[in-house]
């Protein structure tokens, strides 16, 4: 396993632990006498946007920039480079997004407001999933880790497309025009083989602001910037893409994602009823994550292998695939992010119950996925 992937697993596993701590602290504060202060700080305006807005639209754009970098690297020289290696996790990812969405729709088809949250259980939290699998150390085959990484990256890319197509507000033509021009400039820099990162960051900042004002979610600017960064440097230079990827990892894993979790997982349980907690919305999300994810990933994976379209990675069997598919039911940060887009400005009550459904489904998936991996993997570490 090359250094990039090894460093990635190491970073994300530690980051996953921080996510749990940040979420637990947020829940504790939100349900303590400091709850009002917590909400007040998040809704304090700084430079025209609330602190919460800066975190969700600003800092999360950096997270999506990292996703863009990772996807591009995997497409050009990693697990997604060839059809043979990409087809299996790609098919699994499609099933893993389709089945949870269908389960959610089945539960909420009769509620015109709740139905907009259909994409919430379709997401996988890559930091949490990799954090859990890292707890099992060298017992986990490298090929299984690469499968999970590729699946999660394709899943993230699917979420990006969903946000762009289904969670976009009223559009500003002028802002969109500026955004398209800046996108063109970014790829022109790439075509001209500009390897210095500063020009990309300056143009990228303008792109982010334009997208923010356009009605399209600002985080998508991060993905565009990531795809524009060149993989290869000039002769004798390091890869600009890999350099930026390594530079961003600690800030994203140890800063941005835990901060996002802290800002979004603080759910006040005041006024939450058992009838509300067991209503169609949170149940649709929890079961979408806990049942839909493994059902979709495992079924599509099994069918792809049986039909001869793809083959299992070396050293991996269907017990491992099922365990990983359960682990992919950890939606957490990505699901909360989509919930904020679906319900944040429409129904705070729906958003609260959606987040509780996410926490229920994700926590159960994490525990069950770990247990299944623990019992299905070899007792001794892989050589």
UniProtKB/Swiss-Prot annotation:
It comes from the Bacteria. Its main location: membrane. GO terms for biological process: regulation of pH. Keywords: Antiport, Cell inner membrane, Cell membrane, Ion transport, Membrane, Sodium, Sodium transport, Transmembrane, Transmembrane helix, Transport. InterPro entries: Na/H_antiporter_dom_sf, NhaA. GO terms for cellular component: plasma membrane. The chain crosses the membrane at residues 14-34, 47-67, 87-107, 117-137, 146-166, 171-191, 205-225, 252-272, 280-300, 321-341, 356-376. It is found in: Cell inner membrane. It is a multi-pass membrane protein. The keyword Cell membrane applies. Pfam families: Na_H_antiport_1. It catalyses: Na(+)(in) + 2 H(+)(out) = Na(+)(out) + 2 H(+)(in). The keyword Cell inner membrane applies. GO terms for molecular function: sodium:proton antiporter activity. PANTHER family: NA(+)_H(+) ANTIPORTER NHAA, SODIUM ION/PROTON ANTIPORTER NHAA-RELATED. HAMAP family: NhaA. Na(+)/H(+) antiporter that extrudes sodium in exchange for external protons. Belongs to the NhaA Na(+)/H(+) (TC 2.A.33) antiporter family. This is Na(+)/H(+) antiporter NhaA. It comes from Vibrio alginolyticus.
């Amino acid at each position: 396993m090359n250094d990039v992937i090894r460093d990635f697993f190491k970073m994300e596993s530690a980051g996953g632990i921080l996510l749990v701590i940040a979420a637990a602290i947020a829940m504790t504060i939100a349900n303590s006498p400091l709850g009002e202060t917590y909400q007040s700080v998040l809704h304090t305006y700084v430079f025209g946007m609330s602190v919460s807005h800066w975190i969700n639209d600003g800092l999360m754009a950096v997270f999506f920039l990292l996703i863009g970098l990772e996807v591009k690297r995997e497409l050009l020289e990693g697990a997604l480079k060839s059809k043979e290696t990409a087809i299996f996790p790609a098919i699994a990812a499609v099933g893993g997004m389709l089945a949870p969405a269908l389960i959610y729709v089945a539960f909420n088809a009769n509620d015109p407001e709740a139905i907009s949250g259909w994409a919430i259980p379709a997401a996988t939290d890559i930091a949490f999933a990799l954090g859990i699998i890292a707890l099992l150390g060298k017992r986990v085959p490298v090929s299984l880790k690469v499968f999970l990484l590729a699946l999660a990256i394709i899943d993230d890319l699917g979420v990006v497309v969903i946000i762009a197509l289904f969670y976009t507000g009223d559009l500003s033509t002028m802002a969109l025009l500026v955004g398209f021009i800046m996108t063109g400039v970014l790829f022109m820099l790439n075509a001209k083989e500009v390897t210095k990162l500063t020009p990309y960051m300056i143009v990228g900042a303008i792109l982010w602001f334009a997208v923010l004002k356009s009605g399209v979610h600002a985080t998508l600017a991060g993905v565009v910037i990531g795809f524009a960064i060149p993989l290869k440097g000039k002769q004798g230079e390091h890869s600009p893409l890999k350099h930026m990827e390594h530079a961003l990892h600690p800030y994203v894993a140890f800063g941005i994602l835990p901060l996002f979790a802290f800002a979004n997982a603080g759910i006040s349980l005041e006024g939450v009823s058992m009838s509300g907690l067991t209503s169609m919305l949170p149940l649709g999300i929890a079961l979408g994550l806990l049942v839909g994810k493994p059902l979709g990933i495992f079924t599509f994976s099994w069918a792809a292998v049986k039909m001869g379209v793809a083959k299992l990675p070396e050293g991996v069997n269907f017990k491992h695939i099922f365990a990983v598919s359960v682990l992919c039911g950890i939606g957490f940060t990505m699901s909360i992010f989509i919930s904020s887009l679906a319900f944040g400005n429409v129904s705070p009550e729906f958003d609260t119950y959606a987040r509780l459904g996410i926490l229920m489904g994700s926590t159960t998936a994490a525990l069950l996925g770990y247990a299944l991996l623990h019992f299905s993997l070899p007792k001794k570490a892989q050589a």
